[in-house]
Amino acid sequence: TQVFHPYIKKNRGWKRILLFIEFAGVAFIFGLMCVAYLQCHYIINRDMGYQPKGVASCKHDFAEPDNARNNLKSLPYVEGVASIRGSMTWFGNREVTDEGGKVLFTPRCAAFDKDFVPLLGLHIKTGRNFTGERQFLVNQPYVEKMGWKGSGVGEIVPNRGTVVGVLAPFCCGVLPADNEPLEIEYGTNLRNVHVRLKEPFTENLHRLNNEMKKIYPQEDIEFRSLEQDLERYYRPTIIFRDATFLAFITILFITLMGLIGYINDEV
């Protein structure tokens, strides 16, 4: 039997190396799983800077926007109506130039009507909401990019209008709050209509869509939950979290089987 001792010792060495690799893999995947879980928890539960709960939206070009707004306001389960160009999941971009036409920077941009800020529960930390044409709301990074020394209220956006308010930080889609300069201009009868519904939200959303089919039978109008639209942008993070959890369970099972086999061989 002594002839086989070197082979047995060599075989044990490989088993130990394999076990070490497996335990290292478990530790790595466990760490990755913890990071993914914390990231997912932060994104889903962070303060958005506004209140998406109870809000539904629909992108549609109404032939008579004022009439459509009045129809929505008349419904007993609708608390408010507002509109936006863009959406709360993405904003466009527009160059800001000086009076000579030189490009200064390119902020995220959108247009709100005067009811959108209160409907969503956005906060204005300085100044006021806009009331008419050629008025703008911006955020603090925008003020800093422009090099304005004061709060920014009353400053002129070259060739375009006046800043009337500075918004408190809020999230656009999955982007962190105040991640980039933001410029919101005043608009009316914008394409993306938002409504705030009374509780129970799901039931009233169903009633709203049925009512739209009755009023506009020839048009495809469907309001969707803003919260669910936001969750679609979190889905890749949720999928990655679940994938790391499954990988951890799999490699942990393999490692335990290897450990049990090693112990049985040694006993």
Cite the ranges covered by each PLM segment.
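"Rare, low-scoring activations can occur
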Residues: A63-A82, E133, Q140-W148, N159-R241
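Amphipathic alpha-helical segments that mediate coupling or scaffolding at interfaces
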Residues: V3, I43, Y233, D265-E266
